[in-house]
Swiss-Prot record:
GO biological process entries: cytoplasmic translation
Keyword presence, Ribonucleoprotein: yes
Family statement drawn from the similarity comment of this UniProt entry: Belongs to the universal ribosomal protein uL2 family.
Keyword Transmembrane: no
Protein name (database record): Large ribosomal subunit protein uL2
Superkingdom assignment: Bacteria
GO molecular function, one term: transferase activity
Function as written in the Swiss-Prot or TrEMBL entry: One of the primary rRNA binding proteins. Required for association of the 30S and 50S subunits to form the 70S ribosome, for tRNA binding and peptide bond formation. It has been suggested to have peptidyltransferase activity; this is somewhat controversial. Makes several contacts with the 16S rRNA in the 70S ribosome.
Gene: rplB
Bias type Basic and acidic residues, positions: 15-31
Source organism: Treponema denticola (strain ATCC 35405 / DSM 14222 / CIP 103919 / JCM 8153 / KCTC 15104)
Complex and partners: Part of the 50S ribosomal subunit. Forms a bridge to the 30S subunit in the 70S ribosome.
Cellular component terms per the entry's GO annotation: large ribosomal subunit
Taxon lineage: Bacteria, Pseudomonadati, Spirochaetota, Spirochaetia, Spirochaetales
InterPro entries per UniProt: NA-bd_OB-fold, Rib_uL2_dom2, Ribosomal_uL2, Ribosomal_uL2_bac/org-type, Ribosomal_uL2_C, Ribosomal_uL2_dom3, Ribosomal_uL2_RNA-bd_dom, Translation_prot_SH3-like_sf
Positions of the UniProt region annotated as Disordered: 1-61, 224-276
Amino acid sequence: MALKEYKPMTPGLRGRIDLRKDEITAQKPEKSLTTGKKNRAGRDSRGRISVRGQGGGHKQKYRQIDFKRNKYGIPGTVRTIEYDPNRSANIALIFYADGEKRYIIAPKGLKIGQKIMSGEMATLDVANALPLEAIPVGFTVHNIELTIGRGGQMARSAGAGALVAAKEGEYVTIRLPSGETRLVNKKCYATIGEVGNEDHMNTSLGKAGRSRWLGIRPTVRGMAMNPIDHPLGGGEGRGKGRHPVTPWGQPCKGYKTRKKRNPSDSFIVSRRKKKN
């Protein structure tokens, strides 16, 4: 999907870079696969802020996505490719032979009218879902399960794709987009190909108002607050006065927060690599 730039006729257009909507074929979602979505504005069940910097934004409907891909042996046809405000990737509406409709994440190269399939006997074509044991080494996959039957949890964002690196015993070695190498049970399902809309990372909102449309509120530095609001607040000038910390006093900027005895450590061959 190509990028679209604008003439600098206003300050907001000067830095704006959008995606061209050439792939999008439908403007309204399938009504039977959408539900209402309440804007939590970063609040928890007590009404207190649990995630800062969220709130407002345009009203959205949630599209129910089929992450499990458990229509085994039933062929489906790609009917539309649509925009989804809840994720960076586009989604595709699938009409199955038994009459059911489902949304899936749209992989790169998916075409209208294309036939897709899930199951052990599915071919190794883009958008087909198979168990990892049936996918050859060297293939790129997305929407990867961590637990058998739970549905895809890894490599689901725009442009994401993981590499099937090796197979040994009950596990398959997967190299994730983050650079982490991980063992996954060979019975877990994954979808062939990488997620589409790969140019999403190259877009630019261009103005603060577009962030507000997306429900993103301004991020305030701790140093700019009062002492009552943040450990780095107050004082004369711009000095921090201590090592940078979160509003709750936990060190940040390099401080490791992962549990020392995380059960998943035994499945991680090598940790993710830092990106320059």
